[in-house]
Amino acid sequence: MKTLLLSLVVVTIVCLDLGYTRTCHISTSSTPQTCPKGQDICFRKTQCDKFCSIRGAVIEQGCVATCPEFRSNYRSLLCCRTDNCNP
């Protein structure tokens, strides 16, 4: 009986842990990847600098614990909490 109870506890822990993983696009050319523990927000930011008219906007994607603060050189900033929501 103790063995069965222990097995159920282990299965529950494994299932709960799997339920909290997030997958996000990490770079524009990659397939979605699992985010590190504690980073359950996907983000995508597009920013320009003084060379934007020559090389285009810089796109950064990934996983974060908190959404980055919007800055004046960002063209856009997306933060979301569902899998693969930052293509």
UniProtKB/Swiss-Prot annotation:
Pfam families attached here? Toxin_cobra-type (PF21947)
Q: Name one GO cellular component term.
A: extracellular region
Keyword Lipid metabolism tagged: no
Key words of the record: Acetylcholine receptor inhibiting toxin, Disulfide bond, Ion channel impairing toxin, Neurotoxin, Postsynaptic neurotoxin, Secreted, Signal, Toxin
**Signal sequence range:** 1-21
Q: Which cysteines in this chain are paired by disulphide bridges?
A: C24-C42, C35-C63, C48-C52, C67-C79, C80-C85
- What superkingdom does the record give? Eukaryota
Supply one GO molecular-function term. acetylcholine receptor inhibitor activity
Which tissues does the record link to its expression?
Answer: Expressed by the venom gland.
Q: Where in the cell is it found?
A: Secreted
Q: Which InterPro entries match?
A: Snake_3FTx, Snake_toxin-like_sf, Snake_toxin_con_site, Toxin_cobra-type
Q: Which family does it belong to?
A: Belongs to the three-finger toxin family. Long-chain subfamily. Kappa-neurotoxin sub-subfamily.
Q: What does this gene product do?
A: Postsynaptic neurotoxin that binds and inhibits neuronal nicotinic acetylcholine receptors (nAChR) with high affinity (IC(50)<100 nM). Is a selective, and slowly reversible antagonist of alpha-3/CHRNA3-containing and some alpha-4/CHRNA4-containing AChRs.
Quaternary form? Homo- and heterodimer; non-covalently linked.
Name of this chain's protein: Kappa-6-bungarotoxin
Q: What is the organism field in this record?
A: Bungarus multicinctus
